[in-house]
Amino acid sequence: MMSGQELAEVVQIAVEDLHSDHHPVELENHEVTEEDLSPTLKRQRIEINCQDPSIKSFLFSINQTICLRLDSIESKLQVLEATCKSLEEKLDLIMNKQPNPIQVPMVAGSPLGATQTWNKVRCVVPQTTVILNNERQSTSVTKLEAHEESINRTTETLENMLNSAVPGRRHNTIVVKVPAPEDSHNDDDNDSGSEASDTLSNCGNSSSNMGNNVTLITLNSEEDYPNGTWLGDEHNAEMRVRCPITAADMLHISTNCRTAEKMALTLLDYLFHREIQAVSNLSGQGKHGKKQLDPLMIYGIRCHLFNKFRITESDWYRIKQSIDSKCRTAWRRKQRGQSLTVKSFSRRTPSSSSYTTTEGVQNTVSSSSDLQQTSPQALHYALANAQQVQIHQIGEDGQVQVGHLHIAQVPQGEQVQITQDSEGNLQIHQVHVGQDGQVLQGAQLIAVASADPTTGVVDGSPLQANDIQVQYVQLAPVAESSATAQAVEPLQTALQPEMHIEHGAIQIQ
């Protein structure tokens, strides 16, 4: 028989078996305490006890590389942030910058004041923009709508200015943008610098607020010089200029000029007489009050050199310096009273007209058919009222006396022309010109002068040693006392030893 203790153990075991598959019953208000929760299993701690130094150094190098890479990324981000700020400042500057006003277009007229016409040079190309000098290119930014609107406003301003300046103009104008004039170099005469050589002078009606870095050039067409040739690429309407140089002369230039600089200086002599070079330069600036060489012809020379020799902007800069130097040389020869005649032109093919310049204006002087029949015309000069020609008179003792041949008063509808034939002889004519610029009557020969007394012939009589020698045209105003109202009377004789006229219309001082 079991004892009481054994019976209690059997009952306890039976009770545990009955409740082994059932969860303990929890009352509704029962609170779970920490004691009721079963303890969580702890993760076994694994200790890594590695004493290998190579692994430690490898891990250290990886850590160091990652840190350096992060520092590099941080520095690049700082540089990028600074660049963004700089671009924002430049963009704000561009958006707030007011566009420079455009200069008025140039008009044609006589450089010596004889004929003041207002006919613009004809052009056959559409409106486009031509960059003469490559400007420094800044960092390109995205085009914004506001910037495009400012460009449109500038274009509208240009159109309005052109319409107001030249009524009835053709819509075929080349907009030439050139850099603003900078400080010129210190040279012998301090007349011009190549930095400002491409800057085109104001022509026509200009206002005080106009900028100096933009002007207009109207290209001409083939019908302006039917017997002439093209400077530049004749197949590119934007890179060509029609000039009065004949095909034979152009072939001669292309054959003999092996370098770009020599061709530029040769074309300069064909397009501008030495007398014009002496009183002009590329910029039209300087202490001597020089005029500007015709920008249209200078642009034609540039196009010709770029087409023939594929020159660069640095080459063109050097060539411009040579052109300015050539003009200064002619000016010094003029001051010393030396001859300005180009010897190589004595036997070249004469042309019917030539380019001269005053403030970048084209001049083409018409000549009569009678004048063309008497002698071939190579160069034309026209004198108006209050103009004079400086001459050298060679006396019997061989001494040279400097004087001035004054045109005291030219009657209305008349003008005086100085022409030079292919032999280098200078002839002074009086012509009658109508209001439309056409020659009404044949030109009357007033005087003939030559650098070589043996070559000049007047009505079969050679020039004598005491005859005058016309050196160059001087664009200096005549005193009002000498500008009388008397008309220039034609001379019956072609040349007089003393060039004395009774009425004082033409006199030597």
From Swiss-Prot:
Bias type Low complexity, positions: 347-358
CC terms in the record's Gene Ontology section: nucleus
Domain of life: Eukaryota
One Pfam short name: BEN
Region (Disordered): 178-207, 339-370
A molecular-function term among this protein's GO annotations: DNA binding
Coiled coil (UniProt feature): 68-98
Transcription regulation keyword on record: yes
Transmembrane segments: none
Entries under InterPro entries matching the protein: BANP, BEN_domain
The protein's role, per its UniProt record: DNA-binding protein which may repress cyclin D1 transcription by recruiting HDAC1 to its promoter, thereby diminishing H3K9ac, H3S10ph and H4K8ac levels. Promotes TP53 activation, which causes cell cycle arrest.
Record-stated family: Belongs to the BANP/SMAR1 family.
Name listed for the protein in its UniProt record: Protein BANP
Protein's organism: Xenopus laevis (African clawed frog)
